[in-house]
Amino acid sequence: MAALISLFFLFVTLFHDLADGRGLAGTSHDKVIVCYVSRWSVYRPGAGSFDIFDIEPSLCTHLIYCFVGLDENSFKITNIDAFQDLETDNGKGGFKRIVALKEKHKHLKVSVGIGGWNEGSAKYSKMAADPKLRNIFIRSVMNFLEAYKFDGLDLNWDYPTQRGGKPEDRKNYVHLIRELSEAFEPYGFLLTAALRPGKDDMDTVYDLTHVNYYLDFMIIMTYDYHGAWDGVVGANAPIRGQHKDDIYSIEYTVNYLLNHGLTPSKMVFGLPMYGRTYSFNTRGVKDIIFGETTTKTTGFQGPFSKEDGFMGYNEICLEITNKSSLYTQHWEEHTSTPYIRDDEHFITYDNPRSIANKVKYAMDRGFGGFSAWSIVTDDFRGSCDEEPDTYKDYIERFNKISDQNLLKDALISLTEGEGGNQFYVISDKKVRLRLPKPSYANYPLLRTVNEAIFLATEEKKVLDEMEKIKTQRRNELEKGSSPCVRTCTEVCYYGL
């Protein structure tokens, strides 16, 4: 009887996972999807409270549990919130619970993140400067990873050379990651790090050549370019800057890193699951101009996160869904940024459409994957209305393809060679773009990341095939133009 009961519950669990569109195998693309899980979000009120059981592992390839810290006396890795992290004294056992997700989701890797803003920089600077302290730290990390069965360490030292750090941190950071890498390699542990995107940081904080060499992958924090601290409105994560010399944009960061030799496949593109809030200096501002419209230098709080200048997407989308809200939705085309505003407030954020565009941007540049900071502020409960324009820009690019015959030939060629396309299809003798359809409501941003990877991959494949066919036909025409006499069939086939 006990065996039958166990079998029944196993069937129910599997049926639930499959029925709501979520499987156990994880993502079926080849990109890294790093999902940061910020432990402190469990303390947020009401629907903003996030626990480990809210994670949807099928949408991630890697989880990073944030954060643990550095003991400033022993210089060993240590937990920060014993009640949430450990099982002792009736604790919630966060370490064990998040690692246990690997048992059911075999594709998953789970790392622990060390550092973060509240940890500061001074004690990390001191540890990295001293070979003996580095050795103590690294040995403690090895023991920690083995004891709790984590797969690796994500280094979030905020930040070398700053906030109590020293200029020598740039050199000592390399010593630290080199020695960590050498210690990790025999055991297969992952070593990753989150890197700031600003030009000053990239110039003075990181020795990019060595960072690129020693880290398994680099998580580029392509967000927080602008906020209320600027005193004017701006996009949190603009793809393009406001002018050609603007260094505060994703485009500038990515070009800088690629020009300095970073390996694209080791770069992970950071995606913010949140927005930045502003309050106007005076009520009733009519026209918003990014980089010019003035604001107070402290933003307002959201109802769940309760942090000045910050609102999670799960808070913002509730305002959009609320029919009585005074906020109106807008789109800033140049930076590819959504924003909402009323007479007093302004919020720049990322929604499914801007996320889909960023996925396309990073895929075109060969990035190895994407990170979500943090999944706890996605609409993980599925409380909000589905946004209707997620793939608007993909549709517009599709509609701009003028040579439909060439497009059809490319699809036929791909179908014959690879077994068909999922999104670019021929139906009723017409080429159509079939967009991904959500099978469940929660995690709209994280779902979009995964969906857009497939869509962007197929778009590039189709365009490449069109260019290949066009080149082949041009070459054949040039070869056959003289002295061969071409037949009507050939001329018609080539569309002349």
What are these regions (language model features)?
Residues 45, 73-92, 160-316:
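Substrate-binding surface in catalytic domains of secreted glycosidases
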Residues 2-21:
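Cleavable N-terminal signal peptides of Sec/SRP-targeted secreted and luminal proteins
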Residues 37-39, 67, 112-116, 157-159, ...:
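A cross-domain feature marking catalytic cores of carbohydrate-active enzymes
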Residues 56, 146, 211, 258, ...:
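Non-catalytic positions within long, well-ordered alpha-helices that form the structural scaffold/packing
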Residues 63, 112, 155, 180, ...:
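Conserved, mostly hydrophobic/aromatic
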Residues 24-29, 114, 228-229, 235-237, ...:
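Glycan-binding loop/region signatures in secreted carbohydrate-active enzymes
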Residues 29-31, 60-61, 106-110, 149-151, ...:
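Short, well-ordered coil/turn segments that N-cap beta-strands
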Residues 20-145, 171, 396-398, 404-478:
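Glycan-recognition patch characteristic of GH18 chitinases/ENGases
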